[in-house]
């Protein structure tokens, strides 16, 4: 519905208007297929990918493409912060490492490379906050998303201008919308959005949450004894805790959607996004055939992988098409490729590379 734009190596973007139209289409289809009368829908909300950056001007129009969590353009800034002591300084407030895809890193890149873009910005959003804004015309941010982006002082649970100044973006302090809890009502469906989506004007819209919070809730992550693994664009292993883990053994602490808990996370952009790339670039015929026959492309991929015995493969895939959490410039590759190997062997290697990256 909304393809990514890879204009340069390390750049991952989406047209924000196309993204909005894709969400409109999906919402309308859900309302129709559910066979639930729209006036019976008590409220709506969203989850969306974390990290990345979505910016609009005073008229609510995008000032640039949306930037996704697999974007690595800001790697030089993170390297600088690791060397000059910024990493240690901000950790005292955010309890997390600095990633190239976090808003603070990307905003620092814009500050240096495209300041004319930042001069137009009225609001800085995460992806779900942008979609909610389009539905309600109310600008809000949400704790689980922004606390995972080095934007919030976890000691005070608030924005911190001194924290932003550590990244060189203190002048943007006023561009961050008011913070809301996941279940807070942030606005109501406008008439325009109702006409587009099939929802009823005035339907409440809640803040929503960072997608790995939603995955955790769906997986039953409701107490500290449980562990959740997510194989999405990112390889994610997570649990929740009533206090942040600050002994240096984990990379990320952020606020969880259940009040009083923190999400403790290790993650890297080395998961099923690699398989998506393989399907898009090496299985276009099979994908078309699956669509025409009413099958899922994943039925085909699973069958291929099942046919290859591990001992007959001896092919290794390094799942770093989008870099990694510790090496943003890492590159993916197949190692051991011979004339014997076909796409089935390569796909099994991708599966194995994703699994071992966790």
Language-model-derived ranges and their functions:
Residues 1-65, 76, 80, 92, ...:
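N-terminal glycine/serine-rich phosphate-binding loop of ATP-dependent small-molecule kinases
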Residues 2, 7-8, 37, 52, ...:
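Glycine-rich, flexible loop/turn motifs
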Residues 8, 32-69, 97-101, 132-153, ...:
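Short beta-strand-loop/turn "lid" adjacent to the catalytic site in phosphate-handling enzymes
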Residues 82-100, 105-140, 150-170, 185-358:
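Active-site core segments that coordinate phosphate-bearing ligands/cofactors
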Residues 168-181:
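A conserved helix-loop-beta module that forms one wall/lid of the active-site cleft
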């Amino acid at each position: 519905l909304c393809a990514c734009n890879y204009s340069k190596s390390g750049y991952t973007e989406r047209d924000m208007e196309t993204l909005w139209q894709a969400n409109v289409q999906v919402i309308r289809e859900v309302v129709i297929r559910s066979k639930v009368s729209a006036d019976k829908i008590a409220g709506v909300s969203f989850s969306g990918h974390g990290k990345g950056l979505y910016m609009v001007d005073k008229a609510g129009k995008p000032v640039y493409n949306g930037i996704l969590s697999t974007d690595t353009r800001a790697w030089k800034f993170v390297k600088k912060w690791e060397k000059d002591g910024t990493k240690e300084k901000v950790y005292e407030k955010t309890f997390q490492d600095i990633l190239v895809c976090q808003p603070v890193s990307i905003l620092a890149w814009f500050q240096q490379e495209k300041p004319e873009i930042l001069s137009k910005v009225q609001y800085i959003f995460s992806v779900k906050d942008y979609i909610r804004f389009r539905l309600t015309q109310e600008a809000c941010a949400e704790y689980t998303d922004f606390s995972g982006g080095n934007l919030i002082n976890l000691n005070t649970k608030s924005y911190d201008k001194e924290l932003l100044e550590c990244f060189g973006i203190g002048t943007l302090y006023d561009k961050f919308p008011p913070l809301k809890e996941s279940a807070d009502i942030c606005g109501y469906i406008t008439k325009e959005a109702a006409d587009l989506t099939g929802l009823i004007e005035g339907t409440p819209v809640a803040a929503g949450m960072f997608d790995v919070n939603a995955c955790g809730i769906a997986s039953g992550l409701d107490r500290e004894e449980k562990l959740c693994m997510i194989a999405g664009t990112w390889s994610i292993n997570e649990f929740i805790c009533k206090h942040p883990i600050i002994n240096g053994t984990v990379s990320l602490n952020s606020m969880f959607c259940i009040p009083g808990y923190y999400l403790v996370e290790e993650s890297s952009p080395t998961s099923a996004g690699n398989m998506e790339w393989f399907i898009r670039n090496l299985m276009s015929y099979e994908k078309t055939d699956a669509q025409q026959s009413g099958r899922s492309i994943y039925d085909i991929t699973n069958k291929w992988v099942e046919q290859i015995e591990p001992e007959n493969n001896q092919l290794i895939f390094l799942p770093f098409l989008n870099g990694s959490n510790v090496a943003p410039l890492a590159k993916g590759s197949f190692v051991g490729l011979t004339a014997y190997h076909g796409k089935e062997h390569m796909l099994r290697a991708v599966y194995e590379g994703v699994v071992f990256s966790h």
